[in-house]
């Protein structure tokens, strides 16, 4: 049985998804499985036929135009796989095609988990933030640091809009507690109104149930590209500042008129 299951989501970004997949193949910890769900464009072109590693399964999302227009498709894909019964790992990680794991990511999460007697149900690591320039090079422009335990369960640090999905790792078993507590098997919200922080909602709900343990080591890079949906990032300091202010203002308006979903 694999130690770790990773869900990879692909939405027609051939260069970036290849780099994302390579970051999984390059892990120092070898006992993992991955399921790559592609929106269909690359899958139909047989783009992934080069992958021969039996640990990676590639499948189309099967999404319809109506679903793509009305739902958060990344969340929909996550939920579909989490409810499929096909994931066998004790720990679960998520990866979208903009982003990459550093080589020791899986080993670091797994070693922390085992060294703590397999008791932690959720962990988060530190992360680099990068901007991809027109030539394809990634410039590191900031970091998110895992400084202390997080989640309301331990009266810890906030997760929503502070921690990125790529920093987060949870056990498979915590999902049973999630279903019991929230009376749903829709773990990741599919509501498009929450698209700017759907991952944050999920992490906060997990953080209500268990301590989210910090791992200070930088294990991933969240890359902002021309196609990134989470923030219109720029390569200049002024551009980044304006984009951040815009995102915070939008979040403040949404919080004012809609109650927190966690």
Residue spans for each PLM region:
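Nucleotide-sugar donor-binding/catalytic module of glycosyltransferases
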Residues: 1-262
